[in-house]
Amino acid sequence: IFLRHPSGILKGLEQMMDTRELVHEVSLGGKTIDGNVQFFYALIAMACFYGCFIGFGSAIPLQANLSSLAARRTVTPTHKLKIVLSEQISAFFLGYLDVIILILYLRYILRLDFQGNMTPMLLITFLGCLIGVSLGFFVGSLGKMREGVKIGILLAVSMTCCFLSGLMNNTMKDIVEKNIPVLNRLNPAALISDAFYCINVYDDPARYYRNLIILAVMSVLLTGASFFMIRRERYDSL
């Protein structure tokens, strides 16, 4: 070969030295995997979860032992469920607007690799904000504890859930899944993060809807519990 086609030796060496990457790592759904995207999914989950402070702020005006406004509202004939829902809905839309702005910023300004359709992403954040506000309203309705104690509870719960969802360590959610999988089914932040994975990486609609259903059920339970706690509150004097 060297005697008959000496030019072929040079071409062969050039091909051997060509180090172009011919294999690309993709998910089963055919979408490129970025290991850092887990942090941003967990960040969105934290933004949804922090709606708990908006919900908490809406529950405080219904605690007659904490404010004079709440004392006046407590004695009105308005049905307690109507009061709870009106406060919670207004708090929810405020938190939801904040998260929508965050998603638009991450996707169109920072141009992060969110390959899924926007509609499923907005549905995730809808239920994510709902669970956040519901949690805050629930904690705000707990007994006659001081406001500072309730804020401490919200901080502890929200930061623990966000940590376990992978906000500080992108392998944490997988560690929990291997050792205590039920915890990932009960952690709202992990459910939100996993739902984003389902539409952007895994392409797993069944798992996506399972996460949404769990979030919806938890929101309903927390709202119902808040209503019953506010309804049964009694005061010796206002």
Which residues are covered by each model-predicted region?
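Hydrophobic alpha-helical transmembrane segments of multi-pass membrane transport proteins
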Residues: N36-L106
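Membrane-spanning alpha-helical segments of multipass transporters and channels
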Residues: G116-L238
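Helix-boundary and loop/linker segments of multi-pass membrane transporters
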Residues: T32, T76, R111-F114
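Hydrophobic transmembrane alpha-helices and immediately adjacent juxtamembrane helices
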Residues: H5, V75, L81, E233-S237
